[in-house]
Amino acid sequence: MKIKLGNKETIHFVGIGGIGMSGLAIIMKGLGFKIQGSDLSFSKNIERLKNNRIKVFLGHKEKNILNSTILVISSAIKKNNPELIKAKKKKLPIYKRGEMLGHIVSLMKNIVVAGSHGKTTTTSLISSIFSFSKIDPTVINGGVLNSYGNSAKLGKSNWCILESDESDGSFLDIPVTYSIVTNIDAEHLDYYKSLDNLKGSFVKFLDKTPSFGKSFICIDDPAIKSISNKIKNKNFLTYGLDRSANFRIENVINNKDYSQFNLSINLPGQKKDYIKKLQLPIIGLHNIRNAAASAAVCYLIGISNSMIKSGLKNFQGVQRRFNNLFSYRNISFIDDYAHHPSEISCVLTSLREVYREKEIVCIFQPHRVSRLNSLKDEFTKCFKHSDYLILCPVFKAGENIKLNFNYKNFAKQIIKNSKVNLVIVNEEKDILKYVKQNIFGDKIVIGMGAGSISNWMRSLEHKLK
C-alpha cells in the first residue's frame, strides 16, 4: 500500500528513539514531511532528532497523536500502547517501520544489507566508498557513522544504502536493486520460531532480486551455503575465503593497526581481475568479509578499484563497534556492540590474534532474557579468548520474561566451557570497584553488549581518573 506524499501529512513515530526509527524519521523530515514522535526516555538518538528539529514527546500518551495523520510503529511497541490504541480508534493508517521504509526508498536505487551480524559495518563501509567516489547517497544505518555523526542522512543522488531489519520479517517489504546477505544465525527466533523459518525468509529476500540488480552472499557461512541451492533466482554472486567464491579473499594480514587482503574477482564470462592490498582500519576476519562484500557490490556498480581502496582505507568507523575509548594505567578500554555468541567469539578471536601478549578482560552485559534463554549453551562457550570475564546483570530491554535457569550456575558453566576467570557484579558501581582493585598491567578491557554497558564503559574514564 502506498502512502500519499505531501507536506500536509503529520507522521508520528511511536518508539522514535530507536536507532532504526530515528534514522527513518530524519530522512523523512529531509524529504519534507512533518515528523514527530514519542519514546519512554531521553537518549542520544532523541538529542540527534531534536537537533534535526523533530518534536519528541517523552512518554506514550493518547494526546501525543491528536494532530497526527499517519502512525509508524517500531517492532518493540506492544498492542496495549495507548498511542496505538488511539490511532486504531481514529482509523489512522498504521505502518511498521519496515513498511514505511519500503515506501520511501521505492523512489531510489537501493543497496540493502541484510544478515544476522555485520550489517551496520557493511552498510557504513559501502557509504564510505560512495563518498570517496563523489556519489552522495542517502544512508539509513543501524549505527551512528562517525563520518556523519548520525545514523542517517539524505543524499543528493538517487542511490540509497540501507541496513535492513529482519527481526519482524518486514525486511521483505523493502524494494531491492542490489543486496548483501552477510550471514544467518539463530536470532529473532521469538518471531520465526525456528532457524529453518529464518532461513526461508532469507530465501524469499534473495528471490526478490531484479534482473537489473544483483545479490551477494557470503559463501563461507554454513547457513547461507545450506540455502544456496534453494534460491530460485540465481541472480547472485558469492564472496568469502572459499575457493569457489566469485569475490575471493586472499593474502589476509591482521595487526593491531589495520587489516589487509587481496580480492580475486572471477565473474562469469569476464576476464579475471584483482584488487590488491585492500586496507581497512579495523581488525578481524569478520570485518574483512564485510569489506569484501562492500567492495564486491561497488565493483559491480562500476566504482573504480582505486576509489574502493580509498573508501575502505579511510573508513572512519561506527559508534559502539570496537571503539577505543581511553587508556588508564597502561590498560586500553574498548566499547563494542557484540551481544550474540557468534559476535562475541569473533571480536575476542580478533583481539587475541593481534594482542597475543596482553591479557583480555571482557565486561559482558547480556541483552534480552529471551536471547539468553534460547542461546544459553552457546553463551557458555564464546569467551574462550578472554582471560577474565566480568558478568553483569541481564539488560532486559523491556521484556517481562524470567530466566529459565540459575544465573550462578550459568556462570559456573562459562568458567567450565570457556576456561575463563569470572566474577559476577550486581550493578554499575561494582565494575568500577573491581577494575580499580584487580585490573593492572598491560591489559585490554572490552565492554560488550547492546544495552547500557556502552554508557557504563564511557563513564569509567572520569571515574577512574
Per-region residue spans from a language model:
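Nucleotide phosphate-binding/pyrophosphate-handling subdomain across enzymes
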Residues: 2-12, 20, 24-31, 180, ...
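Phosphate-binding loop of NTP-binding sites
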Residues: 2-5, 13, 20, 27-33, ...
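Conserved N-terminal Rossmann-fold NAD(P)-binding element of oxidoreductases
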Residues: 11-16, 448
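NAD(P)-binding Rossmann-fold cofactor-contacting core
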Residues: 33-48
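Beta-strand->loop->alpha-helix junctions that form or flank phosphate-binding loops
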Residues: 38-39, 57-60, 95-99, 140, ...
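Short acidic low-complexity segments
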Residues: 55-67, 430, 435
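C-terminal helical cap/extension that packs against the catalytic core
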Residues: 380-441
